[in-house]
Amino acid sequence: MKPSLLCRPLSCFLMLLPWPLATLTSTTLWQCPPGEEPDLDPGQGTLCRPCPPGTFSAAWGSSPCQPHARCSLWRRLEAQVGMATRDTLCGDCWPGWFGPWGVPRVPCQPCSWAPLGTHGCDEWGRRARRGVEVAAGASSGGETRQPGNGTRAGGPEETAAQYAVIAIVPVFCLMGLLGILVCNLLKRKGYHCTAHKEVGPGPGGGGSGINPAYRTEDANEDTIGVLVRLITEKKENAAALEELLKEYHSKQLVQTSHRPVSKLPPAPPNVPHICPHRHHLHTVQGLASLSGPCCSRCSQKKWPEVLLSPEAVAATTPVPSLLPNPTRVPKAGAKAGRQGEITILSVGRFRVARIPEQRTSSMVSEVKTITEAGPSWGDLPDSPQPGLPPEQQALLGSGGSRTKWLKPPAENKAEENRYVVRLSESNLVI
């Protein structure tokens, strides 16, 4: 009995002895080097495979590769980039965050929560300092990453675009100002700037560059007509002229309504008809017609009265009942003209006056008559009737003479009336 009992433990020991050796051999076969992990698919024929991107295996073993540490979760900078054989090393906290220095696995907190004087925070904990990264693994030959600051520098393309914008905007502004200056200079010289090209009447379509407002449309237009046309081109002046004409017509109507009707004594049938108004000379259609008491020029109310020179007024003594007062009563507050000037047109500060020429006593009368010898009129008396006015007496011949209207001599044609255009304090003699 005793020998059999001793054999049983020995046999059990011999039976259990191969199991640790086999287990050790199988475990040693499944261990992988750093940077690799066991291959779970035995059909490939390999026991280990490289670690996938983003994972690492730092030592021998049969465990799979572990993922790299994410420093962003802890609000820290990467001090060392992870590889297949080492993990990522986290450094200091982000700018604006604080945490224990030298402990990369502890998450950082915002500087707004930090007390005064906390390391890594300044200006009441809202601006991060430029930290120094902790370089580790110098023996392993890993590359280190320089710490960054909180400012983001733009690329070279963005900087070039900013410089281009800064250079182009002033150029466009200067070009616009230069164009405005050129237009003002051209307007001073008489040109006018337009956005489109004007086609002139010539074959080439080009104009002379003169303002059309200063061109004389009619070659026979006199100076006063040109001045009136230039004045009436503006709306303000045209309105003022209309008011002046209305006032003139109203005064004429008032004068004619209150004027006593004067009848001329009956004249001989051969005497030419004379206008009873005697406000003007019959130079347009000759003598007045015999159709009515008023000539064709009187029927047109647009003709003004003839303003005689002071010498002619002094020489002639018109009948008070027949001739109206040719001078206009100046308005209250109106500026008096110079001595000898007769105002023809006055609109605001613009005034057209006539300067009579200084003639000798022999050149006083404006209408000259000559007598020629001829057959006497039987029905006319030898001497002018004493009851006739001076104008009819000038038309009637005395002692068998004939009266003719003659044109002034050639030298008198060259003599023209001078006019003064007065605007404010400056005078322009025409």
From Swiss-Prot:
Residues 184-430 are cytoplasmic. A motif (RFRV motif) lies at residues 349-352. It is linked to Amelogenesis imperfecta 3C: An autosomal recessive form of amelogenesis imperfecta, a defect of enamel formation. AI3C is characterized by generalized enamel hypocalcification affecting primary and secondary dentition. The surface of the enamel is rough and often stained. After eruption, the occlusal enamel on the molars disappears due to attrition, leaving a ring of intact enamel remaining on the sides. It comes from Homo sapiens. May play a role in apoptosis. Induces activation of MAPK14/p38 and MAPK8/JNK MAPK cascades, when overexpressed. Involved in dental enamel formation. Spleen, lymph node, brain, breast and peripheral blood leukocytes (at protein level). Expressed highly in bone marrow and fetal liver. Very low levels in skeletal muscle, testis and colon. Not detected in kidney and pancreas. Its main location: membrane. InterPro entries: TNF_rcpt_RELT, TNFR_19-like, TNFRSF19L_N. GO terms for biological process: amelogenesis; apoptotic process. Keywords: Amelogenesis imperfecta, Apoptosis, Cell membrane, Cytoplasm, Disease variant, Disulfide bond, Glycoprotein, Membrane, Phosphoprotein, Receptor, Signal, Transmembrane, Transmembrane helix. Changing F350A: Loss of interaction with STK39. It holds the Pfam family RELT. This is Tumor necrosis factor receptor superfamily member 19L. Gene3D superfamilies: Tumor Necrosis Factor Receptor, subunit A, domain 2. It is found in: Cell membrane; Cytoplasm; Cytoplasm, Perinuclear region. The chain crosses the membrane at residues 163-183. TNFR-Cys repeats lie at residues 50-90. Belongs to the RELT family.
